[in-house]
Regions:
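Beta-strand-rich binding/interaction modules
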Residues: 78-80, 165-201, 209, 550-572
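Extended carbohydrate-recognition surfaces in non-catalytic/accessory domains of CAZymes
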Residues: 1-70, 121-129, 135-138, 545, ...
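Extracellular recognition modules
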Residues: 112-114, 228-232
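Catalytic cores of secreted or luminal carbohydrate-active enzymes
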Residues: 128-151, 488-493, 498-658
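Short glycine/proline/serine/threonine-rich loop/turn segments at secondary-structure transition edges
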Residues: 60-63, 103-108, 212-226
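Accessory beta-strand-rich segments of carbohydrate-active enzymes
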Residues: 5-6, 11-16, 45-154, 177, ...
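Substrate-binding/catalytic cleft of secreted carbohydrate-active enzymes
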Residues: 294-295, 304-526, 530-552, 567, ...
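Active-site-adjacent substrate/metal-binding segments within catalytic domains
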Residues: 31-69, 73-81, 86-89, 117-124, ...
Length: 658
């Protein structure tokens, strides 16, 4: 039976691989901590060293010992007792080493990892400066599995619905199988205490089993039902190994007019996610990876996430399964494709990404094109063929650099960073895709188009939020666009020639600490589970030029918005789903108490007061001709308007939306 021991403690570290490792650290660990901003990113590029003792019990003789690193960025050379045993050249996928024949039993052994984090490495995602930092360190879990010589290596489950009935085909790979050994599988609802329902037996040398279930519940974004598939290895009737594989039964289909899950059309409304955090880069524990998924689904209200530029944490993907959050999983890289050695490594990365993650029901697309890279049909065909071989049921995509490029993927993806900056909020499908019969996805928008800091003035933060609102609303209206992904969930560290010159790209709808900006509300108002009401303004006259309030918007998922002044109603606004409400009346019927003015004058005065509140100045008053606001009235001079402005606007103790 499997015995897993986590090895996240007792590590020693040195920033120089040639010196003794003396600094005590725990995993996850970053090779270099940074300030929040204004730092030299080259300081995290090094050949560093990690060391740890590992006592191997004498009773483990005859077992198989498997040492796994879930994430070591970026080129890892592993030594056991000074003997080189493995080299792994990807910082974003896990690797497992069979150390059975490399350890001494009944003794303390020493694990040493020489980690090269330099961006000069000839491996993805490196080759030219991307906008994100890749950091360095052993930043995901490390553990040792103690198994029998004959054990289960992998369980791959494919789900289908022929004639509407759920069917699963599982392929089990067994290490050192014997002819008489059998595989037994059973299934039950995840989290249930009920007994497993047996679904069949098969010889370990065959390893493939199919079974049907009539009463299965499908995995849905709003009801992400999961099942535990138990796979047991039986030798002479005795269980020698057990693996629990969590699966979800669902059908994902990409058509020219949209994305369909279990036959129902879903508009993908998501954000791109970077796994970076302040100070420590990638080195955050599983709890924070899980929290990011929680934020995306429960706080921001998105239904999808693009795990951009590299494969992300198993803990993050597991939580997406549990939440019903749809995922695009992506190979490492951005813009650059290197030489043959670089390409071969990317093929290996693709293989590892798919083999390690293909049982996740949340993953609906493999993004297998180096994002925004120049066209390389031969290379792209090789990756595409590999993906289809390893996972025939899941569609593929890839972010294209330009419109109308040749596509080998199932879904054409394009970063429309011009969206929201022109007349039509985003490009039409016909402007981008080479074949209108293929599905089209906006893989990124926003970001560099309109960065905004949390500390920027209200107008800047509102501008970013309105861009998101306009694009999201436009995508909702385009029936032949699968959906869109805003860039980005959070701000993130970048190279000097990107971002704002302080090593941060302020592209997020949240800051690096996961505090929401106003743009977050552009997503939040699409969900109905939690009431949302967010004002774009503090209603402070000192915030904007000319002692004005500027443009004031309310983001809400209510059907109707009402505003009040000191408990008295001002105005009522109808709300368009997914769009903010512009608040342009701060007076309402307050002027009814001013009996010295006619109804027409009160109407014009209200327009004047609201205009000055928003812009800082009155509209032109042409007193000599008896005109006020372009209409003939009894004369109302500017001093009277100023007096009323001070009374009803400056004297306002607070606009209250409801």
């Amino acid at each position: 039976m499997n015995d897993r021991k986590y090895l996240n403690n007792e590590w020693k570290f040195s920033e120089d691989a040639e010196t003794d490792a003396t600094v005590s650290v725990r995993i996850p660990h970053t090779c270099k901590e940074f300030p929040y901003h204004y730092f030299n990113e080259s300081k995290c590029q090094m050949r560093c060293k990690y060391e740890r003792p590992l006592f191997i019990l004498d009773e483990w003789k005859g077992k198989t010992l498997l040492l796994t690193f879930e994430g070591a960025a970026h080129n890892a050379e592993v030594f056991i007792n000074d003997e080189p045993v493995y080299e792994h050249r990807c910082g974003y996928t896990a690797f497992t080493i069979d150390i059975t024949d490399h350890v001494e039993y009944g003794k303390s052994n020493r694990i040493r990892v020489i980690l090269d984090t330099r961006e000069s490495l000839n491996i993805p995602p490196f080759g030219e400066h991307s906008d994100f930092l890749a950091y360095g360190g052993i930043y995901r879990d490390v553990y040792l599995d103690v198994k029998e010589k004959m054990h289960i290596q992998d369980v791959y489950v494919r789900t289908h619905f022929p004639s509407g009935r759920a069917q699963a085909i599982s392929r089990v790979k067994v290490a050192n199988p014997e002819p008489a050994v059998q595989i037994r599988q059973g299934i039950r609802l995840h989290g249930s205490d009920n007994d497993y329902t047996d679904v069949g037996y098969v010889s370990a040398t065959k390893g493939t089993m199919a079974f049907s279930m009539g009463s299965i519940r499908r995995w849905e974004p709003d009801d992400p039902v999961l099942y535990d598939l138990r796979t047991e290895l039986l030798a002479e009737g005795k269980v020698v190994d057990t693996v629990i594989t969590r699966v979800g039964f669902r059908e994902a289909e990409f058509r020219k007019d949209g994305f369909y899950l279990n036959g129902k059309k879903i508009k993908l409304r998501g954000l791109c996610r970077s796994q970076a955090f302040p100070y420590v880069g990638y080195a955050m524990p599983d709890s924070m990876q899980i929290e990011d998924a929680n934020i995306l689904k429960n706080e921001l209200g998105v239904n999808a996430v693009r795990a951009a530029n590299y494969p992300q944490s198993p803990a993050f993907l597991n939580r997406c399964d549990e939440l019903g959050l749809l995922v695009i999983c992506e190979i490492p890289g951005s813009r650059y494709i290197g030489n043959i050695k670089w390409k071969n490594q990317e093929l290996q990365n693709t293989k590892e990404m798919i083999l390690q993650n293909r049982n996740h029901p949340s993953i609906i697309l493999w993004s297998i094109r180096v994002g925004e890279s120049e066209e390389d049909d031969d290379f792209n065909q090789r990756i595409s063929g590999l993906a289809r071989k390893l996972d025939p049921d899941r569609a593929t995509t890839g972010v294209h650099r330009k419109p109308k490029e040749h596509m080998v993927e199932d879904v054409y993806a394009y970063n429309d960073f011009g969206a929201g900056l022109k007349g039509a909020a985003c490009c039409r499908k016909s402007e981008v895709i080479p074949d209108m019969e293929k599905p089209y996805l906006i893989s990124a928008f926003g970001g560099v188009s309109y960065p905004a800091k949390s500390g920027d003035d209200e107008a800047r933060r509102l501008g970013q939020a309105l861009l998101y609102s306009n694009v999201l609303h436009d995508v909702e209206q385009q029936v032949d666009v699968l959906g869109s992904f805003g860039w980005n969930m959070t701000d993130y560290n970048a190279h000097q020639n990107y971002g704002s010159g302080d090593r941060i790209c302020y592209h997020g709808v949240m800051d690096m600490f996961r505090n929401p900006k106003l743009a977050a509300a552009a997503y939040q108002i699409y969900q109905d589970e939690v009431p949302v009401l967010e004002l774009s303004s503090s209603l402070s006259f000192g915030e904007n030029p000319m002692h004005s309030l500027g443009d004031v918007y309310a983001y809400t998922n209510a059907d109707v918005l009402r505003t009040y002044r000191n408990g008295e109603p001002i105005q009522e606004y109808e709300v368009t789903k997914g769009m903010p409400v512009r608040i342009d009346d701060f007076v309402g019927n307050c002027l009814d108490a001013e009996s010295d003015f006619t109804e027409e004058q009160r109407k014009e005065i209200r327009n004047q007061l609201n205009h000055k509140a928003c812009t800082g100045s009155f509209m032109e008053v042409r007193e000599k001709k008896g005109f006020f606001g372009g209409k003939k009235t009894e004369s109302v001079d500017e001093s009277t308007l100023t007096r009323l402005y001070e009374k009803y606007i400056l004297g306002n103790t607070g606009l209250v939306p409801e």
